[in-house]
Amino acid sequence: MTISPVIRLHPDDGVLIARASLPPGTSVADGVTTVERIPSGHKVAIKPIAVGEPVIRYGQIIGFATIPIAPGQHVHVQNIGMGDFAKDYAYCADVKPTPNFDLPATFEGIRRPDGRVATRNYIGILTSVNCSAHVASLVADVFKKNPFTGDNPLADFPNVDGVVALTHKTGCGMTQNEPLALLRRTLGGYARHVNFSHVIVLGLGCEVNQIGGLMEEQKLAGRLRAMDIQEVGGTRKTVEAGIAFVREALADSNKVRRETVPASELTVALQCGGSDGYSGVSANPALGAASDLIVRHGGTVILSETPETYGAEHLLTRRAVSREVGEKLVDLMRWWDEYTAREGAEMNANPSPGNKAGGLTTILEKSLGAMAKAGTTNLVEVLRYAEPVTKKGFVFMDTPGYDPVAATGQVAGGANLVCFTTGRGSVFGCKPAPSIKLATNTAMYKRMEEDMDVNCGTILEGEESVEECGQRIFDLILKTASGQPTKSESFDFGGAEFAPWVLGATM
């Protein structure tokens, strides 16, 4: 079977997507041939587009022509710009019943004493402030596995996935309002995270983010051990006390056993980074198909990255289960508009140089592709950054577009697994929630196979459908939740990627 050199995503589209680099003279539609080289994953016009006329992809506006565009021309930053247009939020218009499966899927999870289910079993070392970061790392390093030498200090504790220090750059020199509340919400979410069997929090002692205040505000009494370096007596004594805590915790943590649990215990963070022109064609829709399966099995998926939903939010408000939920999302978009304007920026500055090299032109185009990760089910809730996820189904969390910051908020909210799509090639990893990475195209997958878990480029090559790839992703999610290591786990990624959102002035 001959595969077309281009991909049409919607009957109304005025552009097609190149499956591979197309030389001039390539036939792409009836009576239309390329007049210049079209890079892989980029757009080619199939009809004349006048100045100011909308450019349509996915059946939606992705920008407006800044100069006349002829059929066969490359459509990108040289001839598309942003512009205002009316959006019909049509709250709740597309809400529909979500049919659940009669026989729920299962995985082998770790049932905690409080009934929650973990996918991993870590011991965590958190810090209240950057000033205690090095001490936390010194403690964790004693128990650190080396993926290159094979050294494993935890060999006698096979049911413990690791000891991880999650450090950050703030905790002091900050205002005691929303910035402090946001940090405490994040740390509280990690302290309660189901994938931690035991947690210790290390502070310096004089910081704004006092451990006592953190524990009181987040109701953490009895959940963790706390130490201040100044009170314990300095670096060496604190490190020794931290090591003693971990050694004591290891024996208890190793007692866990996996058991068969329903897929409804999954809370999956949906992420993308290093996106390209194929993201909205292959990996994101396939992850969306897997997301629908998770929701239909009673589980939860979390979409985030508010700036990368900008311009496509009207498609989500149609799926909101209530006007109140939909209006929460619209309010977030207005906040981000005002926030970026105060900083002298604009939302369309979001696409990175790598995004543009991969074929993405505007934030509207990027958002429409990114939104595909969330599938087709109803939007049941909209949350602030790092707020606990308490509802089953598809939820949205307000986060920046920067992947580590976004994922940190999702995991703080309770995600026990992350699915991360990438077109350019991200090496993101996460702890304590494992991260599955999905490649949008086969060329990148082969180039970075040691870092990629799933090749979704098979969709572009006609080897499988979006739904078939989505089923493959769902099956891998169940295996990963059951303990099968991801590619990022093989390199021990995940500690350095803890990145709480920092708001406000540093003083």
Where are the predicted features?
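Metallocofactor- and cofactor-centric catalytic cores in central/energy metabolism, strongly enriched
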Residues: 1-417, 426-428, 432-507
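Short secondary-structure boundary segments
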Residues: 422
